Design a protein with these regions (language model features):
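A short glycine-rich, Lys/Arg-flanked "PGG" loop and its adjoining helix->strand segment in the class I
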Residues: 138-153
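Class I SAM-dependent methyltransferase SAM/SAH-binding core
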Residues: 63, 67-114
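A C-terminal cap/extension of S-adenosyl-L-methionine-dependent methyltransferases
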Residues: 173-176, 201, 212-280
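Short catalytic micro-motifs in class I SAM-dependent methyltransferases
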Residues: 129-133
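Acceptor-substrate binding/catalytic loop of class I
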Residues: 177-198
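A conserved beta-strand element that flanks and buttresses the S-adenosyl-L-methionine
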Residues: 126
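Conserved class I S-adenosyl-L-methionine
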Residues: 2-58, 91, 153-179, 308-312
Length: 312
C-alpha cells in the first residue's frame, strides 16, 4: 500500500504506538491452571506471609496493579476500597465473580503505561507478579508514582535475575546471560527478570523511598515441594525472608516503599482521567464521553473500560 493510500492515524492509534507492548492474559486460564490446581500452593502461601509483613493493616484507597482474577485482593481486608486494575477483561470478570459487586471494589481494564486516574488519588498500591511482564519498567513506575498521594505505600514484587539457580546455571555454562549484570533479561517474550540494584535505582529515581525488602520463594524447587511437608517449607521460607535486607538470592523479591516528594492532587472530586487527553472524569457507573477528546469510555458488566484500543 502506498503512503497516500493509508488511512489517517486516529488519536487512539497514535497513543497506542507511543506505549510499549503489554502482556495480556485475555482469555487465559491462568488462575485456574496456575493457582487453583494447588500446584503453586507453596508460592501462594509464602507470598501471603510476605504481604502480611509489608502491607499496612488499614488504609483508605488501594490500587492493585495487575490484579488478575483477584487472588491477592482478600489479603487487603483492612483497606476501605480497592481498585482492581488489569489489562485483561476476562481476568477481571473472574475477579468480579469471586469477590462480588460490593461498592468496596472497583474493576478497571487499563494499560499500566496509561493509568486512567487523576494524580495523587491513591493512598497505596501493590504490583505483584506484574513488573515481570513490563519492558519499560521506568515508565510504568513513573505512572504509578503520579497516581499516588504523599507518603503513600507501594508494595512491589519483582522476579530476581540474581537468584541462586540462575547463578549456578551461568557458572556451569548452561545459561548465556549473566545474573550479575544490571540490565533486565527477557528470557521469554514479555517475561523479564530484574537485578535488585536496578529495581532499587528505579524506585529512587521515581520518588519511592525504600523501607524494606524481603526475599520470597527460596525453595521453589519441584522435588522439595513434592517431598517436604508444605507447612514446613512455608515456615522455612518465612524465616529466610528476613535475609532480604542483607542479600537477595531468591527468585522473587518483595519491596515496601513510601512515596517521597510532593504529590499533585486534582482540586475537584474527579476519580478517573482520560488516558488519551488527561481530562478529569467522575466515578460514574455508566458509559462516559470525555469532554476533552470525545472518546467514549464504556462501563459494562461492572467493569470500567479504559484501554485505548481494547481487544476484540
Amino acid at each position: 500500500m502506498k503512503n497516500s493510500d493509508k488511512p489517517a492515524a486516529t488519536t487512539s492509534d497514535i497513543h497506542q504506538e507511543e506505549t510499549p507492548q503489554v502482556c495480556s492474559y485475555e482469555g487465559s486460564d491462568y488462575q485456574e491452571v496456575f493457582w487453583d490446581t494447588g500446584e503453586r500452593r507453596y508460592e501462594d502461601a509464602v507470598e501471603e506471609v510476605a504481604l502480611k509483613r509489608l502491607m499496612p493493616k488499614h488504609g483508605k484507597l488501594l490500587l492493585e496493579l495487575g490484579a488478575g482474577a483477584g487472588r491477592n485482593t482478600p489479603r487487603y481486608a483492612g483497606w476501605e476500597r480497592i481498585v482492581l486494575l488489569d489489562y485483561s477483561r476476562t481476568q477481571l470478570l473472574q475477579a468480579r465473580e469471586r469477590l462480588g459487586d460490593s461498592s468496596r471494589y472497583v474493576y478497571v481494564t487499563a494499560d499500566i503505561y496509561k493509568l486512567p486516574f487523576v494524580s495523587g488519588l491513591f493512598d497505596g498500591a501493590t504490583m505483584i507478579r506484574t513488573l515481570h511482564h513490563l519492558s519499560d519498567a521506568n515508565t510504568a513506575l513513573t505512572n504509578v508514582r503520579r497516581v499516588l498521594g504523599e507518603e503513600a505505600v507501594f508494595i512491589l514484587e519483582f522476579a530476581n535475575k540474581r537468584n541462586l539457580k540462575a547463578i549456578a546455571r551461568y557458572l556451569l555454562g548452561k545459561q548465556k546471560w549473566s545474573p550479575f549484570t544490571k540490565e533486565q533479561v527477557e528470557f521469554v517474550a514479555l517475561n523479564y527478570n530484574f537485578h535488585p540494584k536496578t529495581v532499587r535505582k528505579l524506585l529512587k529515581e521515581n520518588q519511592f523511598l525504600l523501607k524494606k525488602q524481603i526475599t520470597v520463594s527460596h525453595f521453589r524447587i519441584n522435588v522439595l515441594k513434592r517431598r517436604v511437608k508444605h507447612e514446613l517449607l512455608v515456615a522455612l521460607d518465612s524465616l529466610f525472608q528476613h535475609t532480604g535486607s542483607i542479600i537477595q538470592l531468591s527468585p522473587s523479591v518483595f519491596t515496601k516503599s513510601i512515596t517521597s516528594g510532593r504529590s499533585s492532587r486534582s482540586e475537584d472530586d474527579a476519580f478517573f482521567a482520560c488516558p488519551i487527553c488527561d481530562t478529569s472524569l467522575p466515578e460514574a457507573r455508566e458509559n462516559q464521553t470525555c469532554p476533552g477528546c470525545g472518546h467514549v469510555w464504556a462501563y459494562e458488566d461492572g467493569i470500567y473500560e479504559f484501554r485505548i484500543n481494547p481487544e476484540s
